[in-house]
From Swiss-Prot:
Protein name stated in the entry: Endo-1,4-beta-xylanase 3
Gene Ontology MF, one: endo-1,4-beta-xylanase activity
PANTHER family membership: ENDO-1,4-BETA-XYLANASE A-RELATED
Phylogenetic classification of the source organism: Eukaryota, Fungi, Dikarya, Ascomycota, Pezizomycotina
Catalytic activity as recorded in UniProt: Endohydrolysis of (1->4)-beta-D-xylosidic linkages in xylans
Residue ranges annotated for the GH11 domain, each copy included: 28-210
E.C. number: 3.2.1.8
Keyword Signal: yes
BP GO terms, sorted: xylan catabolic process
Top EC class, one word: hydrolase
């Protein structure tokens, strides 16, 4: 969900701890998970077999929603997508989104966003270059907030693309490996989706996931 902590700097040590190897999971079975958190706040439709979904929301959306398609078990496999995404004046993300079971963490690889950059109000971890662009990387701790296990305290990880885009291939492993230098578990994955999230304003998205 959205990040609200105050921005703080972070010194990066010269020698990083050993990084867990990413877990590769076969996706031969195709998309098998529908993310529908408060999809009733807009018009959410999807075709799981085709790997497509759409979300339309009107100004005055009353709460946070996260909708999308993906996999019951996440991995560091690359994800290729194409989208039509419009969120001008909306606090919204178009992102690879998912959870790690332990240490519990929520993560976003933000490809495009509306009027709010989550790294503007979180702890900076620096930058990582991937897929033709620099990504700002940041983290936040959420205390007693909704999670995959109910209400809990967990860490959020964000990579926010500076040269925003609405189609391409996301090399997920590049982000997981960078985050792992800062406590990201890089294993024991819960679900992973290509998602749209918003909690204000109006917007629309039509997304196709091809891998």
């Amino acid at each position: 969900m959205k990040v609200t902590a105050a921005f703080a700097g972070l010194l990066v040590t010269a020698f990083a701890a050993p990084v867990p190897e990413p877990v590769l999971v076969s996706r031969s079975a195709g998309i098998n998970y529908v993310q529908n958190y408060n999809g009733n706040l807009g018009d959410f439709t999807y075709d799981e077999s085709a790997g497509t979904f759409s979300m339309y929301w009107e100004d005055g959306v009353s709460s946070d929603f996260v909708v999308g398609l993906g996999w019951t078990t996440g991995s560091s496999n690359a994800i290729t997508y194409s989208a039509e995404y419009s969120a001008s004046g909306s606090s919204s993300y178009l992102a690879v989104y998912g959870w790690v079971n332990y240490p519990q963490a929520e993560y976003y690889i933000v490809e495009d966003y509306g009027d709010y950059n989550p790294c503007s109000s979180a702890t900076s971890l620096g930058t990582v270059y991937s897929d033709g662009s620099t990504y700002q990387v940041c983290t936040d701790t959420r205390t007693n907030e909704p999670s995959i296990t109910g209400t809990s305290t967990f860490t959020q990880y964000f990579s926010v693309r500076e040269s925003t885009r609405t189609s391409g291939t996301v090399t997920v492993a590049n982000h997981f490996n960078f985050w792992a230098q800062h406590g990201f578990g890089n294993s024991d994955f819960n679900y992973q989706v290509m998602a749209v999230e918003a909690w204000s304003g109006a917007g629309s998205a039509s997304v196709t996931i091809s891998s």
